[in-house]
Amino acid sequence: MMVQSIQIVLPVALFFLIVFNGFTVEGSKKEAQLYRDLLTNYSYLVRPVRNPKKALTVTMKVFIQQVLLVDAKHQMIEVNAWLKYIWTDFRLRWNPLDYENITSVRFQGEDQIWQPDILLYNRYIEDEQESFDITYKTNAVAYSDGVINWIPPGIFKLSCKMDITLFPFDEQICFMKFGSWTYHGFALDLRLDVVKGQEPSADLSTYITNGEWHLLSAPARREEKFYKCCKEPYPTVKFYLHLRRRTFYYVFNVVLPTLLVSFMSLLAFCLPATDLSEKIGLQTTILLSVCFFLTILSEMTPTTSEAVPLLGVFFSALTFIVAMSTTFTILVLNIRYRQITNHYLSPMFRSIFLECLPWLMMMKRPDHKFRRGSSYRDSSADQCVQCAKNAELKSILRGTDNQQQIETNTFYPFPTETLSLNRKVGDGLFIQRRCQIHEEARSEKFTHGMLACEKSLRENGSELANILVTILKMYEVMVSQVERIRKRIALKRKRKDIQDEWKFAAQAVDRFCLIIFTIVFIICCFIFVAIPPIKILD
């Protein structure tokens, strides 16, 4: 049963195979006959025009597929695009009815039919061995009415003059310039393929977006150029590429880290002036970080002196700010660690850094109030200093004779003085200069008084007077020792107070630098954001 079925199916299959093969051979014969008829006496070197004095019209359109690369450093753009050329060849017309309704045929390149020698004028060539024409040689489609449609694809590398002034918020406008290499405008009229009612432009219907650039538009324009040597026009077609850089990558990976690092330089002024190594180490590390980002930026931008990118100017400004902040930090530490033994606190320095600057910076100190151009100590916290009190030396020993009393005032009147003092910063924030002067005057007067009293007692010559002289000598020794201790304590207090004044001056300069550099930093950031004509984030 199986054998009988095979014997029936095989003849039927063989019959249909022979019939369809005959149709195919007949169709191929018609197409081959059409090729022979069209190419008989055809020369691909001759322009397809009946009148040699008339120009052949060639329309052109570009289909942008993708922007592959925008290399600002080498001033080059790489684009994947299709080119579409349409022209009419009167020698390639036929009646489809004579050739089994064949309406179109394909010709392989310029070796069979005439093709326009249109090239990309602004072609970018990296290697000397590269061909100037980089389009893929596809077949040209010829229709029965003589219309030729040729669509060669290619990856085009074109030179583009880029302006990186607003980098990374820049927009670039590049163009693809096409034109005939040998034909002038009277022989080949190159025109744009424009849809009626629309502006001439490249086709973006199949465009694939780029991760770094926005393709905003691709307008087209036809131009004619005349040269001094010739009267014929030379038409060209330009397809512009209006590109805008996507800024999120640069803002997130370059700008924001640099801003944060630079902002940390302001925090160095908030560190105590006693942290010598920490302040200098922090400022130096920040300076190196900004220089590192500046090195990364230099690798992104072209090596040109025509324009400096905005981001480069911003980084340079930040580098300058950090460098100056480091310098002023060193100045603050220099003021902080000055001593009375090697530096003199001049009146002008006092007036500027201990009076005016703290008042401007609205600084506060315990027991002191700052006013414009001066500083004084709060009187509620001061105590009246009494430099001397009334002293009387009365009778120490009383004899049996109650009429005999010795009063010190009979020997010598001791000086008495009362002084109320309001200390001023101009006389020293922490040094009781006036009190010290009055204490020294009081001590000198008291010494003279004791000497005069001793002299009077010696002249008296009584036993009681001799005892009193001995007591006065012992008291004089104690007074001299106490005076020596007082002077030593006063010297230590003086040194400490002057050192505290240097510390306070360093704090005032530190506060001043913090405010100034903060203002400069904010201004730089505002200018960086305000100058670009586009938004920071897309």
Curated annotation (Swiss-Prot):
Any Gene Ontology biological process: monoatomic ion transmembrane transport
Residue intervals on the Cytoplasmic side: 334-513
One GO CC term on file: postsynaptic membrane
TM annotation in the entry: 251-271, 280-300, 313-333, 514-534
MF terms (GO), sorted A to Z: excitatory extracellular ligand-gated monoatomic ion channel activity; transmembrane signaling receptor activity; transmitter-gated monoatomic ion channel activity involved in regulation of postsynaptic membrane potential
Predominant place of localization: membrane
Pfam families referenced in this protein's UniProt entry, alphabetically: Neur_chan_LBD, Neur_chan_memb
InterPro entries according to UniProt: Neur_chan_lig-bd, Neur_chan_lig-bd_sf, Neur_channel, Neuro-gated_channel_TM_sf, Neuro_actylchol_rec, Neurotrans-gated_channel_TM, Neurotransmitter_ion_chnl_CS
Keyword Glycoprotein belongs to the record: yes
Record topological domains on the Extracellular side: 28-250
Annotated signal sequence range: 1-27
Subunit composition and interactions: Forms a homooligomeric channel blocked by alpha-bungarotoxin. The structure is probably pentameric.
Role: After binding acetylcholine, the AChR responds by an extensive change in conformation that affects all subunits and leads to opening of an ion-conducting channel across the plasma membrane.
Protein family according to the UniProt entry: Belongs to the ligand-gated ion channel (TC 1.A.9) family. Acetylcholine receptor (TC 1.A.9.1) subfamily.
Protein name (Swiss-Prot/TrEMBL): Acetylcholine receptor subunit alpha-type acr-7
Source organism per UniProt: Caenorhabditis elegans
